[in-house]
Amino acid sequence: MNPLIASASVIAAGLAVGLASIGPGIGQGTAAGQAVEGIARQPEVDGKIRGTLLLSLAFMEALTIYGLVVALALLFANPFV
């Protein structure tokens, strides 16, 4: 294996995980803050807000998992070799 390709794959894997987690991390923090604010305003709709929050957090977390899958593919099933 070419050492240049191997090192570029490791750097690309790190960037894939790092960049794939920035957006969902910011989004999850914003969504959780807004959910807490909404529950504080209207405590009677607590269950509905919490359910919607958990569903949206799962969709946001999927983006980070996709970045992890790309990184694992670059590290262990390198298509550039």
Curated annotation (Swiss-Prot):
Q: What else is known?
A: In plastids the F-type ATPase is also known as CF(1)CF(0).
Primary subcellular site in the record, as a coarse category: plastid
State what this protein does. F(1)F(0) ATP synthase produces ATP from ADP in the presence of a proton or sodium gradient. F-type ATPases consist of two structural domains, F(1) containing the extramembraneous catalytic core and F(0) containing the membrane proton channel, linked together by a central stalk and a peripheral stalk. During catalysis, ATP synthesis in the catalytic domain of F(1) is coupled via a rotary mechanism of the central stalk subunits to proton translocation.
What is the native source organism of this protein? Chaetosphaeridium globosum (Charophycean green alga)
Q: How does it assemble?
A: F-type ATPases have 2 components, F(1) - the catalytic core - and F(0) - the membrane proton channel. F(1) has five subunits: alpha(3), beta(3), gamma(1), delta(1), epsilon(1). F(0) has four main subunits: a(1), b(1), b'(1) and c(10-14). The alpha and beta chains form an alternating ring which encloses part of the gamma chain. F(1) is attached to F(0) by a central stalk formed by the gamma and epsilon chains, while a peripheral stalk is formed by the delta, b and b' chains.
InterPro entries named among the record's database cross-references: ATP_synth_csu_bac/chlpt, ATP_synth_F0_csu, ATP_synth_F0_csu_DDCD_BS, ATP_synth_F0_csu_sf, ATPase_proteolipid_c-like_dom, F/V-ATP_Csub_sf
The UniProt transmembrane annotation reads 3-23, 57-77
> What's the protein here called?
ATP synthase subunit c, chloroplastic
Bilayer topology annotation: Multi-pass membrane protein
Question: What are the site positions for Reversibly protonated during proton transport?
Answer: E61
**Keywords, sorted A to Z:** ATP synthesis, CF(0), Chloroplast, Hydrogen ion transport, Ion transport, Lipid-binding, Membrane, Plastid, Thylakoid, Transmembrane, Transmembrane helix, Transport
What the entry lists under NCBIfam families is as follows: ATP_synt_c (TIGR01260), PRK07354.1 (NF005608)
Coding gene?
atpH
Keyword Cell inner membrane among UniProt keywords: no
Q: Does the keyword Methyltransferase apply?
A: no
Q: List the Gene Ontology MF annotations in alphabetical order.
A: lipid binding; proton-transporting ATP synthase activity, rotational mechanism
- Family per similarity comment: Belongs to the ATPase C chain family.
Q: Which GO terms describe its cellular component?
A: chloroplast thylakoid membrane; proton-transporting ATP synthase complex; proton-transporting two-sector ATPase complex, proton-transporting domain
Compartment(s) of residence: Plastid, Chloroplast thylakoid membrane
